[in-house]
């Protein structure tokens, strides 16, 4: 569940084929339902092609189409059998599925390592300046996956801005986030944050100075 309400359209076996998150008007709900039913028809056709496939290569291609049409947030829980079959048949990983799963596993490990590191260093009494040094001291940052490096840079951005009030210096960190991997969520979010803080530069500086004065009392 990603938000309220979360609506899922599923078949009789409970396998999702569409849905949406958040409140919608009656017309939008009907459209979402129609779109989901069209997707279900496409899924049925793709699954039929799997059954018709006469070679491993053709079967992998058909199975990949099933994965493409499946709601991505439910793939691991409800289409795991499809992924497993692709991995079994696709010996040379031409689909890239094995590499993608290995990348995802590595990313999860690195994110947990970062969380554990921060949990052991930061407390509710840690100042932004101290937190900045903790984040910057994370070992071997340049050897991490780009997504993990972006997470650390976003933390560095927040702690740097809150400890120094230096908006211009902070946006340079956001630039690094965007340059590192533009297509990720962080890479897309960084330019929007940059535009927002530059548009409200004086107000942000005032708020940070007020917060620093309050902390020093």
Give the predicted meaning of each segment.
Residues 2-43:
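Non-catalytic, surface beta->alpha helical segment in thiol-disulfide oxidoreductase systems
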Residues 26-55, 79, 201-208:
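Pro/Ala/Gly-rich low-complexity, hydrophilic intrinsically disordered segments
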Residues 53-217:
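Oxidative protein folding and maturation machinery
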Residues 14-15, 39, 48, 52, ...:
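A sequence-level detector of short, solvent-exposed, charge-rich linear segments
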């Amino acid at each position: 569940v990603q938000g309220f309400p979360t609506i899922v359209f599923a078949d009789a076996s409970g396998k999702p084929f569409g849905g949406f998150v958040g409140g919608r008007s009656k017309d939008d709900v009907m459209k979402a339902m129609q779109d989901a039913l069209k997707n279900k028809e496409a899924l049925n056709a793709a699954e039929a092609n799997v059954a018709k496939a006469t070679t491993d290569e053709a079967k992998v291609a058909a199975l990949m189409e099933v994965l493409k049409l499946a709601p991505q947030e439910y793939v691991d829980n409800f289409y795991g059998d499809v992924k497993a079959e692709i991995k079994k048949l696709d010996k040379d990983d031409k689909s890239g599925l094995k590499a993608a799963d290995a990348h995802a596993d590595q990313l999860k490990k690195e994110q947990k390592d970062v969380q554990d590191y921060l949990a052991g260093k930061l407390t509710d009494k840690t100042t932004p300046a101290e937190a900045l040094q903790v984040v910057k001291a994370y070992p071997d940052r340049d050897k991490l996956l780009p997504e993990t490096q972006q997470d650390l840079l976003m933390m560095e951005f927040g702690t740097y801005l809150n400890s120094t009030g230096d908006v211009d210096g902070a946006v340079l960190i956001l630039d690094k986030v965007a340059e590192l991997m533009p297509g990720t969520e962080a890479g897309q979010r960084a330019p929007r944050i940059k535009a927002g803080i530059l548009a409200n530069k004086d107000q942000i500086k005032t708020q940070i100075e007020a917060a620093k004065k309050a902390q020093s009392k």
